């Protein structure tokens, strides 16, 4: 393993076991940077939840407000992870094998830090409409104790969770079981 300089001593390159991986230059690389409001690979849309609980997009994050880790696997496929100051994953971006664009998966949190939406690549390409959110998004709801009580999967399948007084999950039921 090789490590980046600096006080955090973060790994920058790792090889699989055996000399063949090293001789072939087949390593897993990591580089560390910040987001940018001008460079396409480093743009990150700023999704949020409005006062009515609806998913909205507030443009892009300002430059240098998010940490970005750039990964390159043994086959030279590149992916990016964008994290906020609370180290929450906001965006997982994978470069297409043809290097002609990206597939983005966004993670949207509420004001107390609960994951509320997962926006897969199909939705980030389709745009935010009620129909596209219903069709493609993962949507999570929580109770006052921050327990997930409802999960909606792409296509509208709903899973409900019931907890006992000791906060243990007692039952989960999807919409097929409810019928």
Predicted regions and their residues:
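Beta-strand elements of repeat-based all-beta scaffolds
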Residues: 1-179
């Amino acid at each position: 393993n090789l490590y980046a300089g600096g006080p955090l001593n973060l790994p920058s390159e790792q090889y699989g076991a055996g000399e063949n991986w090293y001789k072939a230059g087949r390593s897993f690389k990591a580089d560390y940077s910040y987001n940018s409001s001008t460079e396409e690979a480093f743009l990150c849309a700023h999704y949020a939840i409005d006062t009515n609980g609806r998913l909205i997009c507030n443009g892009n994050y300002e430059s240098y407000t998010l940490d970005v880790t750039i990964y390159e696997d043994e086959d030279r496929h590149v992916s990016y992870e964008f994290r906020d100051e609370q180290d929450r994953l906001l965006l997982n971006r994978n470069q297409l094998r043809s290097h002609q664009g990206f597939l983005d998966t966004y993670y949207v949190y509420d004001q107390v830090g609960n994951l509320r939406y997962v926006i897969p690549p199909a939705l980030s390409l389709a745009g935010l409409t009620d129909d596209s959110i219903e069709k493609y998004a993962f949507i999570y709801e929580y109770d006052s104790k921050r327990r997930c009580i409802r999960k909606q999967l792409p296509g509208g399948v709903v899973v409900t969770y019931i907890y006992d007084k000791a906060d243990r999950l007692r039952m989960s039921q999807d919409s097929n079981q409810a019928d």
